[in-house]
């Protein structure tokens, strides 16, 4: 999937969405980034620089544009963004969920606003029953989404989703983005663990005072 030209719709124009949109564009794909306000000055400025060659549109336009869709809004805005985009615009598509349901209301470090017997990934799949949702990109900082390299080696990307073909497609995207190791942890309910790993990642960053770290699976 990743080795052919694709139309990709990225919903979310913050740091995560911009980094993923630029990554897909760098691999030759036709990318639209979706925003509630596609004309906002900071997005227009980004499109004239790092985002050159990427179109901007509404959430609905980006979702309709993509053969592959990426959800990269703030976790607490995810369900509203899906409603604005129109669930029908995701029908039959692979949807990458790159979000975490972080709650900073109690200060730092954040907590998960969804936990226990549910997760944001599962809510996304329920909101998009005709799409094939794969959780990915949520356990690493956005500067390392594409061509990730650390002084100690290459990190592992953990993914979860119910559809095997969709997970293979996302693994292809990751390989094209320079990830040498992708590990499938199972169904979309694995988002519970992946979202919790994000909290660990944030706590480590807070303790270190730096965000240049990732996780790697080592097998003995």
Model-derived segments and spans:
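General beta-strand structural signal in soluble alpha/beta enzymes
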Residues: 56, 132-138, 182-185
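Rossmann-fold NAD(P)-binding glycine/threonine-rich loop
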Residues: 99-149
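N-terminal beta-loop-helix "entrance" segment that forms/cooperates
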Residues: 40-51, 144
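Rossmann-like NAD(P)-binding element
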Residues: 50-96, 100-108
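Active-site-lining helix/loop region of Rossmann-like oxidoreductase modules
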Residues: 155-220
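A glycine-biased structural micro-motif
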Residues: 5, 65, 91-92, 130-133
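NAD(P)+-binding Rossmann beta1-loop-alpha1 motif at the extreme N-terminus of oxidoreductases
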Residues: 1-45
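Glycine-rich beta-alpha junction loops
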Residues: 77, 99-102, 138-141, 163, ...
């Amino acid at each position: 999937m990743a080795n052919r030209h694709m139309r990709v719709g990225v919903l979310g124009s913050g740091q995560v969405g911009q980094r993923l949109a630029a990554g897909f564009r760098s691999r030759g794909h036709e990318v639209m980034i979706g925003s509630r306000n596609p004309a906002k000055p900071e997005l227009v400025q980004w499109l004239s620089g790092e985002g050159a060659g990427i179109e901007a549109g509404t959430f609905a336009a980006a979702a309709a544009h993509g053969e592959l869709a990426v959800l990269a809004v703030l976790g607490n805005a995810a369900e509203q963004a899906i409603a604005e985009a129109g669930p029908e615009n995701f029908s039959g598509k692979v949807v990458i969920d790159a979000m975490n349901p972080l709650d900073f209301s109690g200060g730092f470090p954040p907590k998960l606003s969804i936990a226990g017997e549910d997760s944001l990934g599962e809510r996304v799949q329920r909101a998009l029953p005709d799409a094939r949702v794969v959780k990915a990109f949520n356990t690493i900082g956005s500067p390392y989404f594409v061509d990730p390299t650390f002084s100690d080696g290459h990190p592992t990307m953990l993914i979860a989703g119910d559809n095997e073909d969709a997970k293979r497609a996302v693994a292809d995207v990751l390989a094209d983005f320079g990830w040498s190791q992708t590990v499938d942890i199972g169904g979309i309910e694995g988002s519970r663990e992946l979202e919790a790993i994000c909290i660990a990642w944030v706590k480590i960053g807070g303790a270190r005072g730096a965000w240049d770290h990732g996780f790697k699976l080592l097998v003995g």
